């Protein structure tokens, strides 16, 4: 039986232009629990990645941008010398949607390559 993360990685983000409610705490909890290192921060999910140097941080940032472009769901990124902070939330609903967790799982999977 696949894990929640494996299921999320297989999914594709659905267009969201509003008109739906953000996920409830009960819906968020199992997905957040399945994602390693992600934290809820109000209406966002957030994770900070650390790398050996700036080159690795920048390469990871480019890979995150590739994932977000393919999914048409874009994070807020804060890039430091050897860190990248990634924040996902669904702007159209001012909260969390399944798209945020799909992208978080896909971003995490970049490090498994």
Swiss-Prot record:
It catalyses: (4aS,6R)-4a-hydroxy-L-erythro-5,6,7,8-tetrahydrobiopterin = (6R)-L-erythro-6,7-dihydrobiopterin + H2O. Its EC number is 4.2.1.96. Keywords: Lyase. GO terms for biological process: tetrahydrobiopterin biosynthetic process. It is an enzyme of class 4 (lyase). It comes from the Bacteria. One of its GO terms (molecular function) is 4-alpha-hydroxytetrahydrobiopterin dehydratase activity. Belongs to the pterin-4-alpha-carbinolamine dehydratase family. This is Putative pterin-4-alpha-carbinolamine dehydratase. The lineage of its organism: Bacteria, Pseudomonadati, Pseudomonadota, Betaproteobacteria, Nitrosomonadales.
């Amino acid at each position: 039986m696949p894990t929640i993360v494996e299921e999320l990685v297989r999914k594709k983000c659905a267009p969201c232009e509003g008109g739906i409610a953000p996920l409830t705490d009960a819906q968020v909890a199992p997905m957040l629990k399945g994602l390693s290192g992600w934290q809820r921060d109000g209406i966002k999910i957030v994770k900070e990645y650390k790398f050996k140097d700036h080159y690795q941080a920048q390469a990871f940032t480019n890979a995150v941008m590739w994932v977000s472009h393919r999914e048409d769901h874009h994070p807020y990124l804060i890039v430091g010398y050897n860190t990248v902070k990634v924040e996902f939330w669904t702007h159209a609903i001012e909260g969390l949607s399944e798209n945020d967790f799909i992208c978080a799982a896909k971003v995490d999977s970049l490090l498994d390559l």
